[in-house]
Every structure is written in C-alpha cells, then in structure tokens.
Amino acid sequence: MYLQVTRGSRDRSYLYDDQYEPTVFAFTQKEKFAADAPPQPVALATTPDIRWARRDIKTTNLLGQVMAKQAAHLAGAYEALMIAPDGDVTEAGSSSFFFIKDRELWVRPVSNDILHGITRQTMLRVAEQHQLKIREETYTLDQVLAADEAFITAASIYVLPVGRIDDTEIGDGGVGPVTASLRSAYLELARAEFPKVPETA
C-alpha cells in the first residue's frame, strides 16, 4: 500500500495556516514476491544529485529523482547513482546503495542527504546478524568503483546486485557471495513477516 498525506487544499497561495483539512490518498499495487535465485546484476549510471537539501523527508516532490532516473535509462542503465557537488555518492534514484569492500559493508550515514529507507534499516539489521562490519560513512565514486560487490535495496525490488557502474565492472561483474547471502537472508525475513505471499517473480 502507498499512502500520501497532504496539508490540504486551498486557493493558490504559498502561505498556510491551521485551518486546512488534510487530504489522505492511498492505493495498493499487487507485486510478485522475489524469487530465491539472485537476479542478474544491474547497471547504474552516475548523475549529478540536484535534489533539494531535505532528502530525509519523503515527499511527492520527486523531480530530481525523475530526471536522474530518466538520464540513467537513456544511458542504458537500470538505475541512477547520484553524486553530490562535493564528489561524494549520496544514493540511487529510488533505492538505497550499498557496497562491499574486504567484507565490510559500506553505506552512507543517516542525514538530511538521503532518505532513511525502511529496507535500508532492515538490511543493516540483516548485516549485523551476519556479523559483517558496517561502515556508515561518506564515500567517493572512486571508492565505489574499487568495490568487491555492490547492491541496491528498496521495498519494490528487495535486493538487486549491481554489476556495472558507468563503464566500470564492480568486482567480476557478477553476483557477489556476500550480496547473495544478504539477499537470501532478507527474503527469509520478509517471508517470515509476510507468510501469505506465495507468488514469485
């Protein structure tokens, strides 16, 4: 289910007060559960991160993400990997980005620079259970391109391995063993919490 709540509707104005009646909108969308076998690795394309500064607030103002994902699509990639003006990687267009180097899991720390995704939180819990060292630090694109493995997560895609970023293969370009293990554990946890989802994709 996808839920959206707005302050309400009034005559066009940039000002607001406490007299609005909130508008609540929700819809459901049927999704097939992920198959056990890891999917083929996807490609990412780097794009400038042009979003506003409060990315931790989940809003419907997604123009920056739409433009990034469209640019990635036109470049033949599955998803965008957004780069801040200082050269650091922030996150993917509509997913959280992780990479593995020397069996350490890297992910950008929680701040106003990224969306605090629920799937991201769950993946960190799974990684802790696997006794992986977690590095919640900022990092550059050069660090990412030298990674052993990489993957993206979101509620709609679960865990997808990343095999290439721009023209650079990540690791050997295949599904890394740590990624496969984390994905399997994540799906097991999801099935335990949602046991009545029989279909696979």
Write out the residue ranges for each language-model feature.
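ATP-grasp fold ATP-binding core
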Residues: 1-5
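Helix-start/capping segments and mature chain N-termini
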Residues: 6, 11-201
